[in-house]
């Protein structure tokens, strides 16, 4: 009624935002989890809805989507921070939502969005949260999905993102090599969290490496020399990282 009388065209949209801020303030002051969580969720949803449908400023649709989903992501990030500070609890589920929605929002800044860019950004976001969680808990069981999800997303993106490249064998080989990298990194990083080197991830990593290398070279034999030079350099770097981790593990014994 008031919105129709003063003809603001935004008051009705802003009302849920005001309600969420009141709910948030009440929850923060009282330190009640049952008010903080719905307060932040309502704030994120209502703010995103307001940004998309408001008529105060006019921007391109993709810009509005970036801002709306970005605010939604930021609200979940604030929820994660406030629960950690006020309630002394680490709500990793909130960080997952924040990271995934943030990754989606960033895609709307790209001039050309494709399914592959969404897959890459979302998988990278999920992987980073798992890696942070696993590092915080010092749990290899959380690092495994983090490394695998990240490298799988990267493999799909870098293998199939080039519209000019039409060599299916070579692209499949590239994808499998990225998959293999995830398993190999699990074996390398495991030295930080355990006193012994975890060998079993090298089995799927080695199989995927051989199959991927065979497909990559079979797709274009002219790339064989450059391929072995690059993989040799990467192998030396990973061996150096392993030696550093080995020394680090010995110091902690």
Task: Please tell me what each predicted stretch does.
Residues 1-253:
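Alpha-helical transmembrane segments and their membrane-interface anchoring/capping motifs
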């Amino acid at each position: 009624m008031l919105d129709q009388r003063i003809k603001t065209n935004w008051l009705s949209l802003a009302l849920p935002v005001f309600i969420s801020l009141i709910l948030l303030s009440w929850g923060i002051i009282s330190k009640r989890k049952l008010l903080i969580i719905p307060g932040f969720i309502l704030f994120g949803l209502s703010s995103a809805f307001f940004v998309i449908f408001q008529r105060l400023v006019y921007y391109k649709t993709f810009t509005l989507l970036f801002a709306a989903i970005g605010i939604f992501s930021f609200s979940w990030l604030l929820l994660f921070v406030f629960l950690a500070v006020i309630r002394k609890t680490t709500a990793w589920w909130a960080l997952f939502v924040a990271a995934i929605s943030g990754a989606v929002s960033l895609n709307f800044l790209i001039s050309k969005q494709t399914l592959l860019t969404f897959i890459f950004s979302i998988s990278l976001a999920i992987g980073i949260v798992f890696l942070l969680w696993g590092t915080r808990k010092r749990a290899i069981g959380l690092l495994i999905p983090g490394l695998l999800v990240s490298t799988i997303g990267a493999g799909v993106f870098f293998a199939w993102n080039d519209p000019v490249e039409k060599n299916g064998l070579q692209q499949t080989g590239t994808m499998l090599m990225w998959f293999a990298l995830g398993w190999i990194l699990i074996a390398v990083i495991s030295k930080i969290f355990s006193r012994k080197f975890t060998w079993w991830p090298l089995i799927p990593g080695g199989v995927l490496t051989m199959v991927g290398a065979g497909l990559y070279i079979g797709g274009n034999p002219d790339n064989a020399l450059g391929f072995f030079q690059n993989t040799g350099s990467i192998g030396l770097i990973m061996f150096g990282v392993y030696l550093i981790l080995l020394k680090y593990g010995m110091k902690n014994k």
